[in-house]
Curated annotation (Swiss-Prot):
Lineage top rank: taxon: Bacteria
Pfam families for this protein: DEAD (PF00270), Helicase_C (PF00271)
Entry keywords, A to Z: ATP-binding, Cytoplasm, Helicase, Hydrolase, Nucleotide-binding, RNA-binding
Subunit note: Component of the RNA degradosome, which is a multiprotein complex involved in RNA processing and mRNA degradation.
Binding, ATP: A53, Q54, T55, G56, T57, G58, K59, T60
Protein family per UniProt: Belongs to the DEAD box helicase family. RhlB subfamily.
Biological role stated in the UniProt entry: DEAD-box RNA helicase involved in RNA degradation. Has RNA-dependent ATPase activity and unwinds double-stranded RNA.
Protein's name in the database: ATP-dependent RNA helicase RhlB
Locus of motif Q motif: 9-37
KW Secreted (keyword) present: no
Length: 430
């Protein structure tokens, strides 16, 4: 299989439904990524698929194309009721469910198959109104799906296709009981097409997932390299006292067009946001405490380029495709080595290159050996000059204070910068 982003395999080479091919090509999708080239032939032949591939390699399009093709090629149950969707796509987070729904809209418009969305925290009545009119494909999180099912707003007895996206994350977050509850209300596995996809699939997860699948075929792309080969990784060892100053110095040096900074707790994220906002950066905060409408608005502003920096917990690390992220900063090394892969997978997507910079501080440096064992290589270490770190930083903002706008004009590249370590002052450790 080619190591490049796209293969020579075209969607039109497959026996995909003509409307699916037309919808894909209308959005500029002609050639398959490796995971699409592997998964589509299996799904089109009616085989269940468990696909593992790095983030940003086209998993979502693989299962959406398969789902739409299957529904267009197989008639619905003649006794199907209005509250019975034909396909169910389950995601671990609200943001991912919304994104999948957005990606599916082009296929929906051209094929006429109707979409529904179900996620917690917001829009209960609005989502329900769509479901009451009947949907073909329902995309959602398990909690809201169960809520609607228990109230008979939806009935899963006519499901023909089921998808688990970011399946390992769903199990890790404790959704296994919810998933099994939903599966028990569907037709048997042999009577439906089953697919699951994720960047990481442990043996435990595959074993649990295969309970609900029909002799699934396991496919993977580049299993020997868990981090994308287009991502340049770099590691620093700061003291706790110098950690924030190093981050801000690196931001001045790198001047990223669009970056995500990950930390392990919401309080740490709030602290980072406060320092960067006070320093004039256009920065957004994404944690579990941020209201759902605001979270979606922040993601939209970041995607559209109105924000340059997103500070986030791992709520934003899984499955979200935000184009043109040039840098990922691990302010804290994650406790879960799989989260490292998902975090840095926000950059270097869709054939682009990216940079991942991690800070192994005194508190989280002990997480490094497990991460390096998991990814199969050591992260290159760079040194920095403590005396050259930025030291004229303003006091951080606090969320309890009325925030100044983060949407002001970005500083131009020729704007004066504070004194900081020049690029050639950063040296790779031997």
């Amino acid at each position: 299989m080619s190591k490049t982003h796209l293969t020579e395999q075209k969607f039109s080479d497959f026996a995909l439904h003509p409307q699916v091919i037309e919808a894909l090509e209308s959005k500029g999708f002609h050639n398959c990524t490796p995971i699409q080239a592997l998964a589509l032939p299996l799904a089109l032949s009616g085989r269940d698929v468990a696909g593992q591939a790095q983030t940003g390699t086209g998993k979502t399009l693989a299962f959406l194309a398969s789902t739409f093709h299957y529904l267009l090629s197989h008639p619905a149950n003649a006794e199907r009721q209005t509250n019975q969707p034909r396909a169910l796509i389950m995601a671990p987070t609200r943001e991912l469910a919304v994104q999948i729904h957005s990606d599916a809209e082009a296929l929906s418009h051209l094929t006429g198959l109707k979409l529904g969305l179900a996620y917690g925290g917001d829009g209960y009545d609005k989502q329900l109104k769509v479901l009451e009119n009947g949907v073909d494909i329902l995309i959602g999180t398990t909690g809201r799906l169960i809520d609607y099912a228990k109230q008979n707003h939806i009935n899963l007895g006519a499901i023909q296709v089921v998808v688990l996206d970011e399946a390992d994350r769903m199990y890790d977050l404790g959704f296994i009981k919810d998933i099994r509850w939903l599966f028990r209300r569907m037709p048997p596995a042999a009577q439906r097409l089953n697919m699951l996809f994720s960047a990481t699939l442990s043996y435990r997860v595959r074993e649990l997932a295969f309970e609900q699948m029909n002799n699934a075929e396991y496919v993977e792309v580049e299993p020997e390299q868990k981090t994308g080969h287009r991502i340049k990784e770099e590691l620093f060892y700061p003291s706790n006292e110098e950690k924030m100053r190093l981050l801000q110095t690196l931001l001045e040096e790198e001047w990223p067009d669009r970056c995500i900074i990950f930390a392990n707790t919401k309080h740490r994220c709030e602290d980072i946001w406060g320092h960067l906002a006070a320093d004039g950066h256009r920065v957004g905060l994404l944690t579990g405490d941020v209201a759902q409408k605001k979270r979606l608005r922040i993601l939209e502003e970041f995607t559209q380029g109105n924000l340059d920096i997103l500070v986030a917990t791992d709520v934003a690390a899984r499955g979200l495709h935000i184009p043109s992220v040039t840098h990922v900063f691990n302010y804290d090394l994650p406790d879960d080595c799989e989260d490292y892969v998902h975090r840095i997978g926000r950059t270097g997507r869709a054939g682009q290159s990216g940079f991942s910079i991690s800070l192994a501080c005194e508190e989280y440096a002990l997480n490094l050996p497990a991460i390096e064992t998991y990814i199969g290589h050591s992260i290159p270490v760079s040194k920095y000059n403590s005396d050259a770190l930025m030291n004229d930083l303003p006091a951080p903002k606090r969320l309890t204070r009325p925030p100044r706008s983060n949407n002001g004009p970005r500083r131009h590249n020729n704007a004066p910068r504070r004194s900081g370590a020049p690029r050639n002052n950063r040296k790779r450790a031997d």
